[in-house]
């Protein structure tokens, strides 16, 4: 996506990964501000699975992968030692998204 000033954002549909944010420096030279992956294979195979992608359904760690709501205990998948992290192994970072302008 590019705005009228020439600033640009590139996002993949896999995990909503931000690939590039192109902005000018003080001299008008455009550069990518994102430290991330160069291609979709790098996103999929990354040892840093949450780098520049959407996280969720929950953000951060849920201790022991469980919580209680209205007196009922829920157990979530554990993907960070004993904890549930950023939506677990099937979080938003693993989904293919549809996008419209």
Task: List where the protein language model places each region.
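Surface-exposed acidic/polar loop and edge beta-strand patches at domain peripheries
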Residues: 2-101
